[in-house]
Amino acid sequence: MRAGHRAPSQTHRRPSGGSKRPGRPRRTGRAPPNRPGHHIHTTPSTAAPDERHTGVTMQSRTDAHETVDTAFLAELRSRTPADRVLTSGPEYTRALALFNAAVGVRPSVVVRCASTADVRAGVRASRNHGVPLSVRGGGHDFWGRAFRPGGLVLDLTEMRDVQVDVNHGYATVGGGALSSDVVSAAERAGLTAVTGTAGSVGMVGLTLGGGYGPLLGQFGLAADNLLSAEVVLADGSRVNTDAEHHPDLFWALGGGGGNFGVVTSARIRLHRVPTVISGTILYPIDQSAGILADLGGTLQDSPDELTVDVGFLPGPDGKPTVYVAPTWSGNLEAGNAQNGPVRTLAGLGTPVLAEIGPVARSATLAATDAMFPPGRMGAIRTRTVQSVTGSIATVLGRAAREFTSPFSAIVWHQFHGAATRPTLGSTAFGRREPHLMVELICMWENGENKDHTGGGEDRSSHLRWLEETHAALEPFSLPGGYVNFLGPETPDQVANSYGPNTERLLAVKSAVDPDSVFSATPLPTSTAGA
């Protein structure tokens, strides 16, 4: 299992790319031969079956679209193909499908964007008529920020083009491209991208918030691999930004979240690591004290090539287990050696499961997606700790023994190596010292509730478990947290998440979006908590 790094739907952010307007993008057949300088271009199908689930913020869905301003609709339809402007019907209903079925917000209008021009038209119409704006990329955000009540959604799920430049080692990805789209295209060229652990997460949303993942020890965060971006600003204008052009905006995109515009396409650095040594090791929870103590030293001393996720999740028999998920991105022979740094992790105790070996990165993403399928209800919280001390292990072990659902999990993600080397302030990401990002995931089935009003199985016990665990970790935690997992219910963490970057981020925000058109990812209102 890999807890995916879910990014806030690009509401108030979500990149998009491509310029095809009519209909659905085509999926190309065979990949062209891998030749130096050759460009590999793929356009995935726009509506993968695993994206068809419903949800949003634990609210009832109301027919907000019935009150849509006619002048607003008229402007939208004059600027975009009418069949792409949805206010009701089967296509509109399908467009409401998000990863988290607990979300209940209903937008008034969905525009299925096929180009940057569609995005610009939507932004301008929204501003002209005072309609709240949001952006949907991967739709994986637990908080459901792809939608705003009664608002306009710029749906980028058809903007999933991925173009790989083999010679220069980068990919240009559309704003709606999923992590799996990018990794699959890169693999055909013998390359890979820095992503999180789940393939169904939007690539741009992940990157804008930072992007923890199993390759960060060797290659840094996803945000550290951003080379340039095309951005539609709050006034509807389009800019191309990189380290030399609009450098303040480019800096803000590297971890400042989706606060500055709609990223319609992004160019990201690729790496020649299509195959890794990876797997899952599960230990009985009664061995947790010794295993976590041993892992503490391993995480502190691990080489850049080895990044390890650790945590608790229900095992095959439903009982909680200690979960260890290593990823080795270095020399395969060294990583796969019996006495090497990866396989020794299976000897910390007596595992109930130990599956480790060479695997394509696309397969690791697919495995996480299979463990966390769309359509369940859920909520998330996060903390940041320097290390897993005995006190923290006790808190998390107790929480694991009290799991209220077989679909919940606790995972901490290692932050080390290359990710720690950029100076604080060189990007907008607010923390560069070694640490562990703790992900508390609470998920449960929707039960028999078929109208998607946020009910189904009683959620009170699940949410109580989540909030109590989150609170119990606070005394041992560093200020702030990972912005892609923070929402309106965690304002104190938001205020401390950007550190000394807060003042500069607010200055960029004031320059490019003074009216806060984009606001999905939390941004402090002042430097008071920074």
Which ranges hold each PLM region?
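Soluble FAD-dependent oxygen oxidases
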Residues: 41, 46-530
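Compositionally biased, low-complexity flexible segments
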Residues: 1-37, 44-49
